[in-house]
Swiss-Prot record:
Main location: cytoplasm
GO MF annotations, alphabetized: DNA binding
Compartment(s) of residence: Cytoplasm
Database matches in InterPro entries: Integrase-like_N, TACO1_YebC-like_2nd/3rd_dom, TACO1_YebC_N, Transcrip_reg_TACO1-like, Transcrip_reg_TACO1-like_dom3, YebC-like
Domain of life assignment: Bacteria
Protein name (Swiss-Prot/TrEMBL): Probable transcriptional regulatory protein AFE_0059
GO cellular component: cytosol
One of the GO BP terms on file: regulation of DNA-templated transcription
Amino acid sequence: MSGHSKWSTIKFKKALKDAKRGKIFTRLIREITVAARAGGGDPASNSRLRLALDKAYGANMTKDTIERAIKRGTGELEGVDYEEVTYEGYGPGGVAILIETMTDNKVRTVAEVRHIFSKRGGNMGTAGSVAYQFKKLGLIVFPADADEDRILEAALEAGAEDVVNEGERIAVYTAPSDLHSVVLALEAAGLKPEESEMTMIPENTIEVSGEEAEKLLRLIDFLEENDDVQNVYANYDISDEEMARLEATS
C-alpha cells in the first residue's frame, strides 16, 4: 500500500462531488436502507449500517429521516426495493474501472452504464473481468495535519494493516472485519477520524497522462453523474504535475 500516489488510491464518491445536498442525502438514504435490509436495523449488530449512520450524521441528516430509511430497509415502512449491482469495464489507457450501483431497475442501469462507456472511450466488461484487480479494505481517514505518529502507533496496535500519508489526507487501512474495532481504538486514543468506510483499492496502477488522462477523468465524471451509481473505483495513477496541468486547463 505504501508509496501509492494519492491519485491512485482515490475513491470517487458521488456524495462528496454532488453540488446539491439533496443528492448526497439520496445516496446516504439508499445505503442505510440497503444495509438495514441486508443485516437488520440494529447498528450494534450490523457494522455496515453503523458505517452508513456515521456518514448520515456527519452530513447532518435528521434523526427522523434516518429512522424512516432504516424502517424501509427492515420492511416496517413501504419503500423502493433497491438491488446492489457491480459493473466492470476498462477506460482509456486500459485502466480498470469498477462501478458499484444501487438500482430498482437493472435493465435501465446496465444500459446507461454501457452507453457511458461506449460514448466516452471505454469498454464495458463481463463480470469478473476487473474485480480481481481490486482488494476490499476498511478505510479510516484523518486530515493531513493530524498527528501521524500517534495515528500510526494507535492504528497498528489496534490491528490496522497500513497507515499511509497520501498528501491530502492520512489513510488507515484495515481488513474489512477489523474496521469498526480499529475506529473504536483510535477514538479511545483521542484520535477522531473524519470518515470511515469500506473501499476498493487497486492491486496495481496504470500511469496515464495527456489526452488519455483527460478522457479517463471525463468518463469517470459521467459515470459518477448517473443517479444509480454509488461508487466508482479505478486503478489509474496521475502524477501531481500532470494533475495540476489538467486542473489548470479544465
